[in-house]
Amino acid sequence: MISDKIKLTAKDILEKEFKTGMRGYQQEEVDKFLDMIIKDYEAFHKEFDQLKQQNARLKRELEEQKVAATQVPQQPVQTPVAQPVYNNTNTDILKRLSNLEKAVFGSKLYE
């Protein structure tokens, strides 16, 4: 990411010593060093701009999500209505029906 593009640290800049020539510092060495500083600043500036844009985009998306969440109608949660529990199974019902038939019709069914 950004650390791959940056060649200098604050320590490098602070500790940089230029060799002096007959009339002072060597112009080419100073120019090369300043070129490296300029490239680093350009990389920092570019990365900073990208991060600002990304931050703004993410803030917009967050606001859109908040607005969308407030616009969704809150539907009440429907709990399932408890059905009456019958302990009778089909076989129990058939047995009861058979007993009723015997009581009503008596032995006529079995003659």
UniProtKB/Swiss-Prot annotation:
Divisome component that associates with the complex late in its assembly, after the Z-ring is formed, and is dependent on DivIC and PBP2B for its recruitment to the divisome. Together with EzrA, is a key component of the system that regulates PBP1 localization during cell cycle progression. Its main role could be the removal of PBP1 from the cell pole after pole maturation is completed. Also contributes to the recruitment of PBP1 to the division complex. Not essential for septum formation. Pfam families: DivIVA. This is Cell cycle protein GpsB. It comes from Bacillus mycoides (strain KBAB4). InterPro entries: Cell_cycle_GpsB, DivIVA_domain, DivIVA_fam. HAMAP family: GpsB (MF_02011). NCBIfam families: DivI1A_domain (TIGR03544), PRK14127.1 (NF010725). GO terms for biological process: cell division; regulation of cell shape. It is found in: Cytoplasm. Keywords: Cell cycle, Cell division, Cell shape, Coiled coil, Cytoplasm.
